Regions:
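Mobile "lid/hinge" segments at catalytic clefts and subdomain interfaces of large enzymes
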Residues: 103, 110-114, 118-126, 261
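Alpha-helix capping/hinge segments and adjacent helical runs
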Residues: 68, 174, 196-274, 371-400
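Gly/Pro-rich turn-and-neighbor structural signature
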Residues: 2-5, 151-222
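A glycine-rich, basic-preceded beta-loop-alpha segment at the flavin cofactor/substrate interface
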Residues: 44-60, 65, 72-103, 123-149, ...
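Flexible loop/turn segments at secondary-structure boundaries
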Residues: 5-8, 28-30, 45-48, 84-85, ...
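Glycine- and acidic
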Residues: 2-6, 56-61, 92-110, 149-160, ...
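C-terminal amphipathic alpha-helical interaction region
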Residues: 266, 281-402
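A short core secondary-structure module
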Residues: 2-51
Length: 402
Protein backbone atom coordinates (compact mmCIF):
# COMPACT_ATOMS: atom_id res chain seq x y z
CA UNK A 1 0.00 0.00 0.00
CA UNK A 2 0.93 3.68 0.11
CA UNK A 3 1.16 6.44 2.68
CA UNK A 4 1.07 10.17 1.95
CA UNK A 5 2.14 13.32 3.79
CA UNK A 6 5.07 11.59 5.51
CA UNK A 7 7.35 14.29 6.93
CA UNK A 8 11.04 13.55 6.32
CA UNK A 9 9.97 10.21 4.85
CA UNK A 10 13.16 9.95 2.80
CA UNK A 11 16.54 11.64 3.21
CA UNK A 12 20.24 10.85 3.59
CA UNK A 13 20.89 12.65 6.88
CA UNK A 14 21.05 9.40 8.88
CA UNK A 15 22.12 5.84 7.98
CA UNK A 16 18.65 4.39 8.53
CA UNK A 17 15.07 5.59 8.84
CA UNK A 18 12.57 3.84 11.12
CA UNK A 19 9.00 4.31 9.94
CA UNK A 20 6.14 3.85 12.40
CA UNK A 21 3.32 2.54 10.23
CA UNK A 22 -0.33 1.93 11.04
CA UNK A 23 -1.60 -1.17 9.21
CA UNK A 24 -4.23 -3.86 9.48
CA UNK A 25 -3.62 -7.55 10.17
CA UNK A 26 -5.40 -9.99 7.79
CA UNK A 27 -7.90 -11.11 10.46
CA UNK A 28 -8.30 -7.69 12.10
CA UNK A 29 -11.77 -6.40 13.01
CA UNK A 30 -13.20 -3.60 10.90
CA UNK A 31 -12.74 0.05 11.75
CA UNK A 32 -10.26 1.74 14.07
CA UNK A 33 -10.38 -1.22 16.48
CA UNK A 34 -8.50 -3.30 13.93
CA UNK A 35 -5.42 -1.11 13.41
CA UNK A 36 -1.97 -2.22 14.60
CA UNK A 37 1.34 -0.35 14.79
CA UNK A 38 4.49 -1.58 13.05
CA UNK A 39 8.12 -0.48 12.99
CA UNK A 40 9.34 -0.62 9.38
CA UNK A 41 13.03 0.22 8.77
CA UNK A 42 14.45 1.57 5.52
CA UNK A 43 17.26 -0.96 5.91
CA UNK A 44 16.74 -4.23 7.73
CA UNK A 45 18.75 -4.50 10.94
CA UNK A 46 20.73 -7.60 11.87
CA UNK A 47 20.82 -9.23 15.29
CA UNK A 48 24.13 -7.50 15.97
CA UNK A 49 22.69 -4.09 15.09
CA UNK A 50 24.36 -3.88 11.70
CA UNK A 51 22.46 -2.62 8.67
CA UNK A 52 21.42 -5.24 6.15
CA UNK A 53 19.57 -5.24 2.86
CA UNK A 54 17.17 -2.56 1.66
CA UNK A 55 13.60 -3.04 2.87
CA UNK A 56 10.72 -2.76 0.40
CA UNK A 57 9.69 0.74 1.48
CA UNK A 58 10.37 3.56 -0.98
CA UNK A 59 9.64 7.22 -1.63
CA UNK A 60 7.46 7.49 -4.72
CA UNK A 61 7.33 11.27 -4.82
CA UNK A 62 7.56 14.57 -2.99
CA UNK A 63 4.65 16.89 -2.23
CA UNK A 64 4.90 20.42 -3.68
CA UNK A 65 3.90 22.57 -0.73
CA UNK A 66 3.11 26.14 0.23
CA UNK A 67 5.81 26.16 2.91
CA UNK A 68 8.12 24.09 5.15
CA UNK A 69 10.41 23.38 2.20
CA UNK A 70 13.15 22.31 4.60
CA UNK A 71 11.10 19.20 5.30
CA UNK A 72 10.75 16.55 2.59
CA UNK A 73 7.07 15.57 2.66
CA UNK A 74 6.94 12.20 0.95
CA UNK A 75 4.64 9.71 -0.69
CA UNK A 76 5.78 6.34 0.66
CA UNK A 77 5.09 2.99 -1.03
CA UNK A 78 5.31 -0.32 0.83
CA UNK A 79 5.25 -3.54 -1.21
CA UNK A 80 6.15 -6.63 0.79
CA UNK A 81 8.08 -4.61 3.36
CA UNK A 82 9.17 -6.29 6.59
CA UNK A 83 7.98 -4.70 9.84
CA UNK A 84 7.89 -5.49 13.54
CA UNK A 85 4.68 -5.04 15.52
CA UNK A 86 4.84 -2.46 18.29
CA UNK A 87 2.60 -3.28 21.25
CA UNK A 88 -0.45 -5.49 21.05
CA UNK A 89 -2.41 -6.44 17.91
CA UNK A 90 -5.26 -4.09 16.97
CA UNK A 91 -4.19 -1.44 19.51
CA UNK A 92 -2.05 0.66 17.22
CA UNK A 93 -4.07 3.86 17.45
CA UNK A 94 -3.69 4.02 21.24
CA UNK A 95 0.07 3.62 20.87
CA UNK A 96 0.24 6.20 18.11
CA UNK A 97 -1.65 8.81 20.14
CA UNK A 98 1.15 8.83 22.72
CA UNK A 99 3.33 10.29 19.97
CA UNK A 100 0.52 12.40 18.51
CA UNK A 101 0.05 14.31 21.75
CA UNK A 102 3.78 15.04 21.92
CA UNK A 103 3.71 16.10 18.27
CA UNK A 104 0.77 18.43 18.90
CA UNK A 105 2.65 20.12 21.71
CA UNK A 106 5.62 20.39 19.37
CA UNK A 107 3.51 22.08 16.71
CA UNK A 108 2.40 24.65 19.27
CA UNK A 109 6.01 25.39 20.18
CA UNK A 110 6.94 25.52 16.49
CA UNK A 111 4.24 28.15 16.02
CA UNK A 112 5.56 30.02 19.02
CA UNK A 113 9.05 30.06 17.50
CA UNK A 114 7.74 31.50 14.24
CA UNK A 115 5.80 34.14 16.17
CA UNK A 116 8.92 35.19 18.04
CA UNK A 117 11.30 35.32 15.06
CA UNK A 118 8.77 37.24 12.97
CA UNK A 119 8.27 39.70 15.83
CA UNK A 120 12.00 40.27 16.34
CA UNK A 121 12.53 41.00 12.65
CA UNK A 122 9.50 43.28 12.42
CA UNK A 123 10.61 45.35 15.42
CA UNK A 124 14.02 45.99 13.86
CA UNK A 125 12.41 46.99 10.57
CA UNK A 126 9.80 49.24 12.22
CA UNK A 127 12.48 51.17 14.10
CA UNK A 128 14.54 51.67 10.94
CA UNK A 129 11.91 52.28 8.23
CA UNK A 130 11.02 55.95 7.75
CA UNK A 131 7.57 56.76 6.37
CA UNK A 132 5.17 59.69 6.96
CA UNK A 133 4.95 61.81 10.04
CA UNK A 134 3.05 60.89 13.18
CA UNK A 135 -0.48 62.29 13.15
CA UNK A 136 0.29 64.23 16.32
CA UNK A 137 3.39 65.84 14.79
CA UNK A 138 6.99 64.88 13.96
CA UNK A 139 8.65 62.45 16.36
CA UNK A 140 12.02 62.53 14.58
CA UNK A 141 12.25 66.12 13.26
CA UNK A 142 15.90 65.65 12.34
CA UNK A 143 14.93 62.98 9.80
CA UNK A 144 12.97 63.23 6.54
CA UNK A 145 10.15 61.12 8.05
CA UNK A 146 9.31 59.32 11.28
CA UNK A 147 10.14 55.66 11.85
CA UNK A 148 6.97 53.65 11.33
CA UNK A 149 7.06 52.33 14.89
CA UNK A 150 5.50 55.64 15.98
CA UNK A 151 2.27 54.87 14.11
CA UNK A 152 -0.54 53.35 16.24
CA UNK A 153 -1.51 50.51 13.90
CA UNK A 154 2.11 49.42 13.46
CA UNK A 155 2.34 49.36 17.25
CA UNK A 156 -0.84 47.30 17.41
CA UNK A 157 0.58 44.68 15.03
CA UNK A 158 3.89 44.51 16.88
CA UNK A 159 2.25 44.35 20.29
CA UNK A 160 -0.14 41.63 19.13
CA UNK A 161 2.78 39.47 18.02
CA UNK A 162 4.66 40.23 21.23
CA UNK A 163 1.69 39.38 23.44
CA UNK A 164 1.04 36.13 21.60
CA UNK A 165 4.71 35.21 21.95
CA UNK A 166 4.90 35.99 25.68
CA UNK A 167 1.58 34.37 26.53
CA UNK A 168 2.49 31.37 24.42
CA UNK A 169 5.83 30.95 26.17
CA UNK A 170 4.13 31.02 29.55
CA UNK A 171 1.65 28.35 28.47
CA UNK A 172 4.33 26.17 26.85
CA UNK A 173 6.65 26.30 29.87
CA UNK A 174 3.78 25.68 32.28
CA UNK A 175 2.70 22.63 30.26
CA UNK A 176 6.28 21.34 30.17
CA UNK A 177 6.47 21.59 33.96
CA UNK A 178 3.23 19.63 34.23
CA UNK A 179 4.69 16.91 31.99
CA UNK A 180 7.79 16.70 34.19
CA UNK A 181 5.55 16.17 37.21
CA UNK A 182 3.35 13.72 35.35
CA UNK A 183 6.38 11.58 34.54
CA UNK A 184 8.51 11.99 37.65
CA UNK A 185 6.54 13.07 40.72
CA UNK A 186 6.66 10.46 43.53
CA UNK A 187 2.97 10.93 44.40
CA UNK A 188 0.64 8.97 42.09
CA UNK A 189 -2.25 11.37 42.76
CA UNK A 190 -0.12 14.34 41.67
CA UNK A 191 0.94 12.47 38.54
CA UNK A 192 -2.71 11.82 37.70
CA UNK A 193 -3.70 15.46 38.28
CA UNK A 194 -0.88 16.69 36.08
CA UNK A 195 -1.75 14.18 33.35
CA UNK A 196 -5.35 15.41 33.37
CA UNK A 197 -4.25 19.04 33.12
CA UNK A 198 -1.84 18.26 30.26
CA UNK A 199 -4.69 16.49 28.46
CA UNK A 200 -6.86 19.60 28.84
CA UNK A 201 -4.16 22.02 27.72
CA UNK A 202 -2.71 20.03 24.80
CA UNK A 203 -5.37 21.00 22.21
CA UNK A 204 -5.11 24.61 23.39
CA UNK A 205 -1.32 24.60 23.02
CA UNK A 206 -1.61 23.16 19.52
CA UNK A 207 -4.55 25.13 18.15
CA UNK A 208 -4.44 28.46 19.99
CA UNK A 209 -0.71 28.92 19.54
CA UNK A 210 -0.84 27.97 15.86
CA UNK A 211 -3.83 30.25 15.20
CA UNK A 212 -1.94 33.03 16.94
CA UNK A 213 1.21 32.20 15.00
CA UNK A 214 -0.63 32.69 11.72
CA UNK A 215 -2.02 36.03 12.94
CA UNK A 216 1.35 37.18 14.29
CA UNK A 217 3.43 36.25 11.24
CA UNK A 218 0.86 37.90 8.96
CA UNK A 219 0.97 41.07 11.07
CA UNK A 220 4.76 41.11 11.07
CA UNK A 221 4.87 40.69 7.30
CA UNK A 222 2.42 43.58 7.03
CA UNK A 223 4.78 45.80 9.04
CA UNK A 224 7.23 45.48 6.14
CA UNK A 225 4.66 46.71 3.65
CA UNK A 226 5.52 45.67 0.09
CA UNK A 227 8.93 44.42 1.18
CA UNK A 228 7.22 41.81 3.34
CA UNK A 229 5.73 40.28 0.20
CA UNK A 230 9.16 39.97 -1.42
CA UNK A 231 10.92 36.64 -0.99
CA UNK A 232 14.37 38.11 -0.31
CA UNK A 233 13.26 39.79 2.93
CA UNK A 234 12.29 36.46 4.46
CA UNK A 235 9.03 37.50 6.11
CA UNK A 236 6.74 35.75 3.64
CA UNK A 237 8.47 32.46 4.45
CA UNK A 238 7.41 32.75 8.10
CA UNK A 239 3.81 33.22 6.95
CA UNK A 240 3.97 30.25 4.56
CA UNK A 241 5.67 28.04 7.13
CA UNK A 242 3.20 28.95 9.87
CA UNK A 243 0.13 27.94 7.87
CA UNK A 244 0.78 24.19 8.10
CA UNK A 245 0.69 24.34 11.89
CA UNK A 246 -3.08 24.85 11.79
CA UNK A 247 -3.42 21.71 9.65
CA UNK A 248 -1.00 18.92 10.50
CA UNK A 249 -0.93 16.67 13.56
CA UNK A 250 -4.70 17.07 13.65
CA UNK A 251 -6.37 20.18 12.22
CA UNK A 252 -7.34 22.90 14.65
CA UNK A 253 -10.98 21.95 14.17
CA UNK A 254 -10.10 18.45 15.38
CA UNK A 255 -8.28 19.99 18.35
CA UNK A 256 -11.36 22.02 19.21
CA UNK A 257 -13.60 18.94 19.02
CA UNK A 258 -11.12 17.10 21.24
CA UNK A 259 -11.17 19.93 23.78
CA UNK A 260 -14.91 20.52 23.94
CA UNK A 261 -16.22 17.06 23.14
CA UNK A 262 -13.73 14.83 24.98
CA UNK A 263 -11.70 16.87 27.45
CA UNK A 264 -14.54 19.08 28.74
CA UNK A 265 -17.96 17.54 28.10
CA UNK A 266 -16.49 14.02 28.13
CA UNK A 267 -15.92 14.15 31.88
CA UNK A 268 -18.73 16.63 32.67
CA UNK A 269 -16.24 19.46 32.95
CA UNK A 270 -14.11 17.90 35.71
CA UNK A 271 -10.74 18.85 34.17
CA UNK A 272 -11.92 22.34 33.30
CA UNK A 273 -13.30 22.87 36.81
CA UNK A 274 -9.93 21.94 38.33
CA UNK A 275 -8.18 24.51 36.18
CA UNK A 276 -10.94 26.99 37.00
CA UNK A 277 -10.26 26.50 40.70
CA UNK A 278 -6.64 27.58 40.15
CA UNK A 279 -7.89 30.75 38.52
CA UNK A 280 -10.42 31.34 41.31
CA UNK A 281 -7.75 30.90 43.98
CA UNK A 282 -5.49 33.40 42.23
CA UNK A 283 -8.35 35.88 41.86
CA UNK A 284 -9.22 35.53 45.55
CA UNK A 285 -5.61 36.05 46.60
CA UNK A 286 -5.05 39.09 44.39
CA UNK A 287 -8.53 40.58 44.55
CA UNK A 288 -7.58 42.74 47.52
CA UNK A 289 -4.77 44.40 45.55
CA UNK A 290 -5.90 47.67 43.99
CA UNK A 291 -3.06 47.52 41.48
CA UNK A 292 -4.21 44.10 40.27
CA UNK A 293 -7.85 45.03 39.66
CA UNK A 294 -7.31 45.75 35.97
CA UNK A 295 -6.17 42.13 35.57
CA UNK A 296 -8.11 40.03 38.08
CA UNK A 297 -11.52 41.56 37.38
CA UNK A 298 -11.66 40.68 33.66
CA UNK A 299 -10.03 37.32 34.42
CA UNK A 300 -12.71 36.47 36.98
CA UNK A 301 -15.45 37.72 34.65
CA UNK A 302 -14.22 35.56 31.77
CA UNK A 303 -13.91 32.53 34.04
CA UNK A 304 -17.57 32.88 35.02
CA UNK A 305 -18.60 33.31 31.38
CA UNK A 306 -16.72 30.16 30.32
CA UNK A 307 -18.44 28.16 33.06
CA UNK A 308 -21.89 29.33 31.94
CA UNK A 309 -21.05 28.89 28.25
CA UNK A 310 -19.85 25.33 28.82
CA UNK A 311 -23.10 24.44 30.58
CA UNK A 312 -25.18 25.96 27.79
CA UNK A 313 -23.30 24.10 25.05
CA UNK A 314 -23.50 20.87 27.02
CA UNK A 315 -27.28 21.14 27.30
CA UNK A 316 -27.62 21.84 23.57
CA UNK A 317 -25.27 18.97 22.71
CA UNK A 318 -27.40 16.60 24.77
CA UNK A 319 -30.23 17.29 22.32
CA UNK A 320 -28.04 17.40 19.19
CA UNK A 321 -24.33 16.41 19.20
CA UNK A 322 -23.72 18.61 16.15
CA UNK A 323 -23.97 21.60 18.51
CA UNK A 324 -20.47 20.66 19.69
CA UNK A 325 -19.16 21.00 16.14
CA UNK A 326 -20.89 24.35 15.73
CA UNK A 327 -19.32 25.86 18.84
CA UNK A 328 -16.01 24.04 19.22
CA UNK A 329 -13.60 26.25 17.26
CA UNK A 330 -14.77 29.48 18.88
CA UNK A 331 -14.97 27.75 22.26
CA UNK A 332 -11.32 26.68 22.08
CA UNK A 333 -10.27 30.24 21.30
CA UNK A 334 -12.24 31.52 24.29
CA UNK A 335 -10.50 28.95 26.49
CA UNK A 336 -7.14 29.92 25.01
CA UNK A 337 -7.77 33.51 25.99
CA UNK A 338 -8.81 32.42 29.48
CA UNK A 339 -5.51 30.58 29.90
CA UNK A 340 -3.51 33.52 28.51
CA UNK A 341 -5.36 35.96 30.77
CA UNK A 342 -4.47 33.82 33.78
CA UNK A 343 -0.78 33.79 32.86
CA UNK A 344 -0.66 37.47 31.97
CA UNK A 345 -2.26 38.29 35.32
CA UNK A 346 0.39 36.20 37.06
CA UNK A 347 3.15 37.92 35.09
CA UNK A 348 1.66 41.32 35.90
CA UNK A 349 1.68 40.45 39.61
CA UNK A 350 5.42 39.75 39.52
CA UNK A 351 6.08 42.83 37.39
CA UNK A 352 4.19 45.05 39.84
CA UNK A 353 6.25 43.65 42.70
CA UNK A 354 9.38 44.82 40.85
CA UNK A 355 8.03 48.04 39.34
CA UNK A 356 10.40 50.20 41.40
CA UNK A 357 13.46 48.19 40.45
CA UNK A 358 14.03 50.26 37.34
CA UNK A 359 14.46 47.12 35.23
CA UNK A 360 12.98 47.53 31.76
CA UNK A 361 12.15 43.80 31.67
CA UNK A 362 9.41 44.19 34.28
CA UNK A 363 8.13 47.44 32.78
CA UNK A 364 7.78 45.74 29.39
CA UNK A 365 6.00 42.74 30.95
CA UNK A 366 3.47 45.00 32.64
CA UNK A 367 2.91 47.05 29.50
CA UNK A 368 2.40 43.91 27.41
CA UNK A 369 -0.08 42.53 29.94
CA UNK A 370 -2.06 45.77 29.85
CA UNK A 371 -2.11 45.69 26.06
CA UNK A 372 -3.33 42.09 26.09
CA UNK A 373 -6.21 42.81 28.48
CA UNK A 374 -7.19 46.02 26.65
CA UNK A 375 -6.82 44.98 23.00
CA UNK A 376 -6.83 41.18 22.63
CA UNK A 377 -8.90 39.70 25.45
CA UNK A 378 -12.08 41.58 24.36
CA UNK A 379 -12.18 39.25 21.34
CA UNK A 380 -13.85 36.74 23.66
CA UNK A 381 -17.08 38.75 23.76
CA UNK A 382 -17.73 38.13 20.06
CA UNK A 383 -16.57 34.52 20.26
CA UNK A 384 -18.95 33.76 23.11
CA UNK A 385 -21.78 35.32 21.14
CA UNK A 386 -21.04 33.17 18.08
CA UNK A 387 -20.82 30.06 20.27
CA UNK A 388 -24.28 30.82 21.59
CA UNK A 389 -25.65 31.33 18.07
CA UNK A 390 -25.47 27.57 17.79
CA UNK A 391 -26.00 25.17 14.92
CA UNK A 392 -28.98 26.60 13.05
CA UNK A 393 -27.26 29.47 11.16
CA UNK A 394 -24.69 26.97 9.84
CA UNK A 395 -27.05 24.21 8.72
CA UNK A 396 -30.23 25.94 7.53
CA UNK A 397 -28.83 26.58 4.04
CA UNK A 398 -30.01 23.80 1.74
CA UNK A 399 -27.04 21.91 0.31
CA UNK A 400 -28.34 22.43 -3.21
CA UNK A 401 -28.02 26.21 -2.77
CA UNK A 402 -24.26 26.08 -2.25
Amino acid sequence: GAKIFISAGEHDMVPNILHLVLARLPDAPAGSKGISLFLVPKFLVGADGSLGERNAIFCAGLEHKMGIHGNATCQIVLEGAVGTMVGEPNKGLAAMFVMMNAARLGVGVQSLGLTEVAYQNAVVYAKDRLQMRALSGPKAPDKPADPIIVHPDVRKMLMTARAYAEGGRALAIYTALLIDKELNHPDADVRKECADEVALLTPIVKAFLSDNGWIATSHCMQVYGGHGFIHEWGMEQYVRDSRINMIYEGTNTIQSLDLLGRKVLGDNGAKLKKFGRKIAEFVEEEGISEAMQEFVNPLAELGDKVTKLTTEIGMKAFQNPDEVGAAAVDYLRVCGHLVFAYFFARMAKVALEHKDSGETFYKAKLTTARFYFAKLLPETAGLIRTCRAGLAPLMEMDEALF
